[in-house]
Amino acid sequence: SLMQFETLIMKIAGRSGIWYYGSYGCYCGAGGQGRPQDASDRCCFVHDCCYGKVTGCDPKLDVYTYTEENGAIVCGGDDPCKKQICECDKDAAICFRDNIDTYDNKYWFFPAKNCQEESEPC
């Protein structure tokens, strides 16, 4: 679920996903189009693509299970669809963490009119 995604971003990247990525670049937040503006925005693009491959459950609403083992998030549970959502969220949170140094405030609340370039395929 999106609330779990927020929790994973806090645990892994150490910052609020809603605050920092809720409306960032061309892909972070609702929707997405155009060309990712930087590495952090690309994390959101890849996350959107990952959610797009999920079938049989709702990535934004369905709750998944995970554990923390030696500081790492381990996705679990018996439902392969929900496990896939967890992996999408975990990978995005790791991507945010690994690209924190590229985060640029100029892409915060970036106008959609600046995201008109042709989108690349997933």
UniProtKB/Swiss-Prot annotation:
Key words, A-Z: Calcium, Disulfide bond, Hydrolase, Lipid degradation, Lipid metabolism, Metal-binding, Secreted
Catalysed transformations (reactions): a 1,2-diacyl-sn-glycero-3-phosphocholine + H2O = a 1-acyl-sn-glycero-3-phosphocholine + a fatty acid + H(+)
UniProt keyword Cytoplasm present: no
SMART domains from the UniProt entry: PA2c
GO CC annotation terms, alphabetical: extracellular region
Catalytic residue positions: H47, D89
GO BP terms in the entry: arachidonate secretion; lipid catabolic process; negative regulation of T cell proliferation; phospholipid metabolic process
CDD domains, alphabetized: PLA2c (cd00125)
Binding residue positions for Ca(2+): Y27, G29, G31, D48
Tissue specificity of this protein: Expressed by the venom gland.
Top-level enzyme category: hydrolase
Cofactors that this protein relies on: Ca(2+)
Quaternary structure, from the entry: Monomer.
Note: Is not neurotoxic.
Function (record text): PLA2 catalyzes the calcium-dependent hydrolysis of the 2-acyl groups in 3-sn-phosphoglycerides.
Protein name: Acidic phospholipase A2
Native organism: Gloydius blomhoffii
